From Swiss-Prot:
GO cellular component, one term: large ribosomal subunit
Gene that this polypeptide is encoded by: rpl22
Organism this protein belongs to: Nasturtium officinale (Watercress)
Subunit structure: Part of the 50S ribosomal subunit.
Protein name: Large ribosomal subunit protein uL22c
Family: Belongs to the universal ribosomal protein uL22 family.
Keywords noted in UniProt: Chloroplast, Plastid, Ribonucleoprotein, Ribosomal protein, RNA-binding, rRNA-binding
A molecular function GO annotation: structural constituent of ribosome
GO BP term, pick one: translation
SUPFAM superfamilies membership: Ribosomal protein L22
Length: 160
C-alpha cells in the first residue's frame, strides 16, 4: 500500500480539531462561509454568526493563527484561510432511560475539522520579483535584484 506523504510547505500552517461534538453537516454550513477569506475577516464573521458551531471553529482558526505566528513567524494580517475541511467523526451511542424499564438509543455525531492558513506575503514577493524581471534592461543573471540600465552613470561599466 502506497501512502501519500504530505509535502513540506513553508507558507502554510494548520490546526486540527478532532471529535468536536457537532454534526459534520452543520459544521460545513459555517466552514463554507469562511473558506478563502482573510484571518481577521473570518474571525469577525464567526463572532457575528448565530450558530452554536461557530465557537469551536473560532477557536480552531485562532489556534491556527497562533501556530503561524509562533512556529513560523508569520504576521496575522497576511494570513488567509486557504483550505478548510470537515470530515465525519465517530458516532457516540448512548441509551436514554424511558418509562417501564425501556431505553431509547441516542446517537451523538462528532466531526473532525482541519483549518489551513497560508501566508500571502510570500506570493506577493514572488509577483514583485516576476514584475522586476519583465522590466526592460533587467536580466535573470542579476540575482541581487539591482537593475542597471545603459543610461545610468556608474554601475558595471565603471569598474575596470
Amino acid at each position: 500500500m502506497i501512502k501519500n506523504r504530505k509535502k513540506k510547505s513553508y507558507t502554510s500552517v494548520y490546526a486540527l480539531g478532532q471529535y468536536i461534538s457537532m454534526s459534520a453537516h452543520k459544521a460545513r454550513r459555517v466552514i463554507d462561509q469562511i473558506r478563502g477569506r482573510s484571518y481577521e475577516e473570518a474571525l469577525m464573521i464567526l463572532e457575528l454568526m448565530p450558530y452554536r458551531g461557530c465557537y469551536p471553529i473560532f477557536k480552531l482558526v485562532y489556534s491556527a493563527a497562533a501556530n503561524a505566528s509562533h512556529n513560523k513567524g508569520f504576521k496575522e494580517t497576511n494570513l488567509v484561510i486557504s483550505k478548510a475541511e470537515v470530515n465525519q467523526g465517530n458516532t457516540v451511542k448512548k441509551l436514554k432511560p424511558r418509562a417501564r424499564g425501556r431505553s431509547y438509543p441516542i446517537k451523538r455525531s462528532t466531526c473532525h475539522i482541519t483549518i489551513v492558513l497560508e501566508d500571502i506575503s510570500f506570493y506577493q514577493q514572488y509577483e514583485e520579483y516576476l514584475m522586476y524581471l519583465k522590466k526592460p534592461g533587467c536580466s535573470n543573471e542579476n540575482r541581487n535584484l539591482t537593475c542597471h540600465d545603459t543610461y545610468s552613470s556608474g554601475g558595471l561599466w565603471d569598474k575596470k
